[in-house]
Amino acid sequence: VTFAAVLDAGNIDYRFNTLDYTPALDSVVGEWNERSRAANGHWNRTKSPPRHILFCWDSVIDKKVYETHLTLPDAAIDKMRRSSMYKNYLGKTAYYDSVQIGLAPEGKVAVWIDGIGFEPNHRVIPAVLKTVSGDKLALCKGITKHPNGYKYYGDTPEFIKNKVYPYGVW
C-alpha cells in the first residue's frame, strides 16, 4: 500500500503516507484464512473506528496500480466500539480495535476485524468495495513504488516459478 485516506466514524479525515510495515504472513499462501494476523501497527491509527477507507496499492504480479474504496458496514463499526468478552494478554478489557486488509492478484481485497488473543479474526463484508486500475484511477494515478516498472526480488522468482496465474483461491 502506497497511500491511504481514512474517514473515521467520528468524521475525522486521516491521510497516511508513512504506512505500517506488514511482515510476510507465511501461513497466508494461496488462500485467505481466519487465524493469521499482522502485528499491530504503530502509525496508522484513527480516533474512532474507520468507516471509509481509500487506498492505493501496487500488485507486482499484475504489474499495475490499484485503487480500492471500501466502506465498513455499521455492524462492524458497532463491534469495534464495544469491548470484547475476551481479555487482552495483560488480563484487561480488550476492544476490537484493529482492521486487517488482505490484497491478492486481480485486485481482490478482503477485510477482517482482528480477533482477541486466540480468537479467530472476524471476516467483514464491506458495505462498499470497489477496486479499479488503469484509466479508471482517480486519486491513485501516478502513486506507485515501482515508477520504473515492476521487478521481482529475493525469493519471489523461485516462489512463482511454475505456478499458474492467478495463483491461489482468493
Put a short name on every predicted segment:
Residues 12-61:
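Tryptophan-paired
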Residues 160-168:
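Intrinsically disordered, low-complexity linker/terminal regions across diverse proteins
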Residues 2-8, 15-19, 71-73, 102-104, ...:
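A structural detector for beta-sheet-dominated domains
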Residues 64-71:
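Edge beta-strands of extracellular beta-sandwich domains
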Residues 74-79:
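Extracellular interdomain linker/stem segments of modular secreted and single-pass surface proteins
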Residues 52-56, 69, 100:
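Beta-strand secondary-structure signal
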Residues 80-155, 169:
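Compositionally biased low-complexity segments at domain edges in trafficked proteins
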